[in-house]
A protein has these predicted regions:
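Conserved acidic segment of CheY-like receiver
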Residues: 1-12, 17-21
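Conserved sequence signature across two-component system core domains
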Residues: 7-8, 33, 51
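Short hydrophobic/Thr-rich beta-strand motif most characteristic of the beta2 strand and flanking loop
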Residues: 26-34, 42
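Acidic catalytic/metal-coordinating carboxylates
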Residues: 35-38, 61-64
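Active-site beta3 strand of CheY-like receiver
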Residues: 46-52
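Receiver (REC) domain active-site loop signature in two-component systems and cognate sites
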Residues: 57
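Alpha4 helix (beta4-alpha4-beta5 surface) of REC/receiver domains from two-component response regulators
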Residues: 64, 85-102, 106, 112-113
Length: 122
């Protein structure tokens, strides 16, 4: 079973992601939040296999949260799932420790495929 944590400030998107991810019987969403600070605390406790992280959130953004998530859960894969489409942003988040960068324009099925790819390769 692959445990996934969702960190995005849009509740409707988190709901859709949960539905798409849990269509795969090997994937399970173990937690979610719209607040990066709460996310870091819960990720440290839950130690999920994968975190889906948005960059643009109120308070602490995903770019600030990324290294803190890495410290709190070093064995967790982080997929940044963001509306920023600039190549520079993708390069920056990968440089800061994300395992993958997916634009929100991609299909939600692509997110599920990426989760699977990451967890198979580990």
């Amino acid at each position: 079973m692959v445990d996934i944590y969702l960190c995005d400030d849009v509740p409707e998107l988190r709901h859709l992601l949960r539905i798409i991810l849990e269509e795969d019987p090997g994937l399970r969403v173990v937690g979610e939040t719209g607040d990066a600070q709460i996310g870091i605390e819960e990720i440290a406790e839950l130690q999920p296999n994968v975190v889906l992280l948005d960059l643009s959130m109120p308070g602490m953004d995903g770019l600030e949260a990324l290294p803190l998530i890495r410290r709190a859960a070093p064995d967790t894969s982080v997929i940044v799932f963001s509306g920023f489409t600039e190549a520079k942003m993708a390069a920056l988040v990968l440089e800061r420790g994300a395992d993958r960068y997916i634009e929100k324009g991609e299909s939600l099925e692509r997110v599920r495929e990426t989760v699977r790819e990451l967890t198979i390769s580990r």
